[in-house]
A protein has these predicted regions:
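Compositionally biased P/S/T/G-rich terminal and signal peptide-adjacent segments
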Residues: 32-79, 149-153
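Metal-dependent catalytic neighborhoods of phosphoester/phosphodiester hydrolases
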Residues: 236-247, 264-274, 391-394, 414-417
Length: 486
């Protein structure tokens, strides 16, 4: 009996050992066949994109929003869209960023660009990060820019008005130019300046002379912001020319250059490779040639949608930048649509400058803004009166229209009547209360501006032999738009 019990015990032990061996083998096989499960942190953008710049940025929590691929729009300017996001999700995301150690540099306030866009900009380590929410579109734009800096003029500073005389006025000067181009100088109440473009290289010495004529003798003009609408030579040429001459550089102080350098993708999509990127590359680097009042190198700042700049007594809103135009959705492949849209608020009045913007810019603007946004006191006509179209004219209301050239046609192709937009310009002139060009001299508007009170200064003496002098020839051909009122 004892022997039988021993045999049963041995059999039981053997079964236990075999069972254990079986489970050991199965566990080993299972471990070898089952891949290791990677834990994905969906609170970070690393869960949604492989782009290196976004790996350490918290993801935006959204119920219905869709994340786009990351696109490079410029000089380290990496854009991600969140289509279908809400204002509440935007505000929650702003709080999330601050909790994650992102330092808020600025925002555009509860006014939210007149109710169209909330925008806030942050810094962390060497990263600048701007979040803009287009309220009408339920669309959030995220722009991550490693190595970029944010302008101090994105924040209001009351001290900039200290010592300003109570009777000081803000004036806008549309400068007389050699040929084609944009050149606007805004003289602020503190005696400093904001410049838009500046014209071609040949206009550079006249621009410097004019700035010096506007300040007390012996003082250097202080340019708080120099905006370049886009990288075409009739807009950035004067700035580049000045930067190459140390004597000219030393005639002015420049606090910052505001320019959006396009990426190779933008050049390829907008121009099918037909645009020379050299001008854009040079303009993107030019700020370092200048010094501010403290002797530091001026910086380049990239204007982004929804940002608001405070220069002394005026505000400038970035109504549109190239980041709002998806590359695959351009209505036309026209590099002019990289022009930035800037809405100026001066003494309660509205002044729009948008460079050479073309169909894409106009149509996107009409989608993003009600027509009331374009109830304009002063309007700088697009592309020197070439890109004038009835559909946009009828969408807006104008009091004063400034022609940035006295011509109705392109100077380089006067034989193409389609560029003249004769009927379209006539419709624009009939739609405004007054129009004026710089054909007889620089035009000056004093704010608050009343229709009919502009002044035309004495025509320039073209004393510098640095460019083709076409003034008399153009006047003789009758291409001058002139002035008028309705």
């Amino acid at each position: 009996m004892k022997k039988k019990v021993t045999i049963v015990a041995l059999i039981a032990l053997l079964l236990v050992l075999l069972t254990g061996l079986f489970f050991f083998i199965m566990l080993k096989v299972t471990a070898e066949e089952t891949p290791e499960v990677e834990v994905v942190d969906i609170t970070m953008f690393s869960a949604y994109t492989d782009h290196e710049v976004y790996q350490d940025i918290p993801a935006m929590k959204t119920e219905n929003g869709k994340f786009s691929a990351v696109e490079d729009y410029g000089k380290k300017d990496y854009l991600m869209n969140v289509n279908g996001s809400t204002v509440e999700e935007y505000k929650e995301y702003i709080a999330t960023l601050e909790k994650a150690g992102f330092k808020k540099h600025s925002d555009n306030g509860e006014d939210a660009m007149e109710g169209y866009a909330y925008t806030a900009s942050f810094t962390k380590d060497n990263l600048a990060f701007t979040v803009s929410h287009a309220i009408r579109e339920d669309h959030t734009y995220l722009v991550a820019s490693p190595g970029d800096e944010l302008s101090p003029y994105l924040n209001y500073d009351a001290s900039r008005m200290e010592g300003v005389p109570a009777d000081a006025k803000t004036t806008v000067h549309m400068l007389e130019l050699h040929t084609n181009g944009n050149s606007f100088v805004i003289k602020l109440k503190n005696g400093h300046f904001v410049i838009h473009d500046g014209g071609i290289a040949a206009d550079a010495p006249y621009l410097l002379d004019y700035l010096e004529s506007q300040v007390p003798e012996g003082e250097k003009p202080v340019i708080e912001g120099w905006f370049i609408s886009h990288a075409h030579g009739d807009h950035s040429g004067a700035l580049l020319a000045i930067s190459k001459n140390i004597q000219d550089v030393n005639r002015i102080y420049v606090e910052g250059v505001y320019f959006s350098q396009p990426s190779p993708m933008v050049y390829e999509k907008l121009t099918m490779g037909g645009e020379d990127p050299t001008n854009g590359l040079m303009t993107g680097m030019v700020s370092g040639a200048f010094k501010d009042q403290n002797g530091n190198a001026a910086k380049n700042y990239r204007p982004l949608y929804g940002q608001r700049y405070y220069f002394c007594d005026i505000m400038i809103d970035v109504s549109l930048s190239m980041e709002q135009f998806p590359p695959e959705a351009y209505y036309t492949t026209d590099f002019n649509d990289t022009s930035v849209w800037l809405m100026h608020h001066i003494e309660g009045q509205r002044f729009l400058i948008a460079g050479d913007t073309h169909h894409t810019g106009m149509r996107v603007a009409m989608n993003m803004f009600d027509s009331s946004y374009f109830d304009l006191d002063v309007f700088a006509v697009f592309h020197h009166a070439i890109n004038v179209w009835d559909y946009f004219t009828d969408y807006c209301k104008y009091k004063t229209v400034l022609y940035t050239s006295w011509r109705e046609a392109s100077i380089w192709e006067p034989s193409r009547p389609s560029l003249a937009r004769v009927a379209e310009n006539e419709h624009l002139r009939q739609s405004c209360e007054e129009y004026v060009s710089h054909g007889n001299g620089t035009v000056v508007l004093t704010f608050p501006y009343k229709v009919g009170t502009y002044k035309v200064l004495k025509p320039l003496d073209w004393k510098y032999d640095n460019g083709v002098k076409l003034i008399d020839k153009q006047h003789a051909e009758g291409q001058w738009v002139g002035t008028g009122s309705n």
